[in-house]
Amino acid sequence: MDYYRKHAAVILATLSVFLHILHSFPDGEFTTQDCPECKLKKNKYFSKLGVPIYQCMGCCFSRAYPTPARSKKTMLVPKNITSEATCCVAKAFIRVTLMGNIRLENHTQCYCSTCYHHKI
């Protein structure tokens, strides 16, 4: 009888440790983000006006890393973390005029490039 209690205790302890480790990770740590690659996508709002309008949408490269000490010395406000990012932007486009006065850029080709507009 003591033999079975020892095995049950070991199994419960192992299960407890496993559950503790599982719950210590933030939600979504093991899942990939649901973000499509950078490509052309039809704009539903402006395409209703008769001409199909496309825009570049999707995800590109982004990362953060510790700022090298050499770079920190040249900064006006030293930062511990440096980040790099690229955004999905139009490589080529055609200017289109809708309804006589609405001017749009109809994207024809997309690629990942330097982000110019981060936050407004």
From Swiss-Prot:
InterPro entries, A to Z: Cystine-knot_cytokine, Glyco_hormone
Gene Ontology cellular-component terms listed: extracellular space; follicle-stimulating hormone complex
PROSITE patterns listed in its UniProt record: GLYCO_HORMONE_ALPHA_1, GLYCO_HORMONE_ALPHA_2, GLYCO_HORMONE_ALPHA_3
One Gene Ontology term from the biological process aspect of the record: positive regulation of steroid biosynthetic process
One Pfam family here: Hormone_6
Source species, domain of life: Eukaryota
Statement: the UniProt record of this protein carries the keyword Glycoprotein: yes
Keyword set, alphabetical order: Disulfide bond, Glycoprotein, Hormone, Secreted, Signal
Molecular function (Gene Ontology), one example: follicle-stimulating hormone activity
Gene3D superfamilies linked to this entry: Cystine-knot cytokines (2.10.90.10)
Span of the signal peptide: 1-24
SMART domains, A to Z: GHA
Cell compartments where the protein resides: Secreted
Family label: Belongs to the glycoprotein hormones subunit alpha family.
Role played: Shared alpha chain of the active heterodimeric glycoprotein hormones thyrotropin/thyroid stimulating hormone/TSH, lutropin/luteinizing hormone/LH and follitropin/follicle stimulating hormone/FSH. These hormones bind specific receptors on target cells that in turn activate downstream signaling pathways.
PANTHER family: GLYCOPROTEIN HORMONE ALPHA CHAIN, GLYCOPROTEIN HORMONES ALPHA CHAIN
Protein name, per record: Glycoprotein hormones alpha chain
Organism of origin: Equus asinus
Gene: CGA
